[in-house]
Swiss-Prot record:
Protein name as it appears in the record: UPF0178 protein AHA_0543
Family named by the database record: Belongs to the UPF0178 family.
Regions annotated as coiled coil: none
PANTHER family: UPF0178 PROTEIN YAII
Domain of life from the UniProt record: Bacteria
Family matches, as InterPro entries: UPF0178
Origin species: Aeromonas hydrophila subsp. hydrophila (strain ATCC 7966 / DSM 30187 / BCRC 13018 / CCUG 14551 / JCM 1027 / KCTC 2358 / NCIMB 9240 / NCTC 8049)
Amino acid sequence: MPIWVDADACPIPVKEILYRAAHRAQVVTTLVANQGLRVPPSPFIKTQQVEKGFDVADHVIAQQVKPGDLVITGDIPLASWVIDAGGEALNPRGEIYTRETIKARLGMRNFMEELRSAGVQTGGPAPLNAADKQRFANALDKWLIRGKLS
């Protein structure tokens, strides 16, 4: 039950939560990015640097994820691929994507992309706040506990 992290866009506070959880729960956590990453020394924390390019890290994660794995990503298409592969996807704000919710999220993402391509200013997500970090940590802990019980 490893954890994969779409690390290029993952906020630093979320990575720090993941580092502590990987060490505490002794779960292999692999951060995939198209740039070098500094991570704390740990046998449970690994990095995988991929070529620069659009969605390269996403494709690498999607190819390696197995049923039961957890992927940390805010990328909706990657989350959909993960769910289709039998994995679980959690975004940095603590929302778990499910088969029931991912299609609606994909539809909204595509709609917003169409608006942006038509020149409509849609804004971006709000900055990560303390409640988001707490929600993420709680969702991660629930996943880790479920994994230990199975």
